[in-house]
Amino acid sequence: VNIESIKNNSELFRFLSNFYEGDFEAFLDCVIKKPKSAIRVNTLKANKDTILERLLKQGFKLKKVAFYEYAFVVEESPVELGNTVEHFVGYYYVQSLSSLIPPLVLAPQPGEVVLDIASAPGSKTTQMAQMMENRGVIVANDVDIKRVKALANNIDRMGVLNTIITIEQGHKFGKLYPETFDKILVDAPCSALGTLGKNPEVVKWWSREKIGRLMATQKSLILSGFDALKPGGIMVYSTCTVTPEENEYIVNYLLQEREGVEILDFHLPGVKLTSGLTEWERLIFKKELVKCKRIEPHLNPGFEGFFIALMRKSPS
């Protein structure tokens, strides 16, 4: 991606320059760079030190990450990260720093019943299984059969044993399994503006009309997730985009449509989290949306743009 290609999509250019105002250049500089790769060391397969030792011996240079002890930024790699024996046997997962965060915020515990409503290809599912020490149950759902194959491969490769794969439209879970899950991750399909460095094709198809279609999916998924949550249960809604229409607007929609939604605050060591918006253009959102968090690439070098809302369903 370069600045010219963004300028060629006038709708996108107008949105980003309007949204970021004085930070527009800084945002573009960061988001169009492909971030350094990061890996999550998989303790379901071996202990951390064993895995690190094997990688360091081969000449990998790794840097610790403040917010998660099993994540490392790859400063130098002698071979492609996907081409090592260690990758093949599931000792690590190549995962962006931002995408490690929704599972950490959701914090599933061993023994809980968890739903990942749009889970393929499985970075967050396999991370949650690791956090749960392969105990309890994860229902990993996706509607796209091609992506489900990748999900199944990753679950297998990473030694995940506590996960059931379902191929169902996510918006049906609330009706099929009301008040069933302790924790739910709604990592919604989105316009991916936070990942332009990795997904330059977004610039070609991004439009207001496309956002409208995505919003319909996002609304149905957040309602379905909330309905499938037990009273007292915890849900995370996340996207890798920056548009308020796909983020704060969707959480605000849930607050309008359902009683008993509490937005919770959270912090992460070493990550600069920006507060959620309470207004955007002609839209006014509920005040508690300030507790939602944005990860802005220009404030967090090496991170992609991300949005995360942590919510609790009040005990009935």
PLM region descriptions:
Residues 1-316:
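S-adenosylmethionine
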